Amino acid sequence: MAEKKKVAEEKRVARVTDIIAGSPKSFEDAVQVGFARASKTLRGITGMRVLEQRIAVENEKIIEYRVRMEVIFLVEN
């Protein structure tokens, strides 16, 4: 019986939301910027997945690296 209770306590529900972040430095920095910002408002982040990468160009120069990401976080009780 105690084992069934343990399994029930381990059940979790997660939510996924999309964000877009940018950086003038690199794609890696854009991911860090996105994670830092998401961490300010979302609790229980368990993972992120980069869905898309884009580069903004102006006057024949790269001005921003952009990433679209899924943020996975646990839903609180």
What are these regions (language model features)?
Residues A2-N77:
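N-terminal, polar/charged subdomain of small-to-medium soluble alpha/beta proteins
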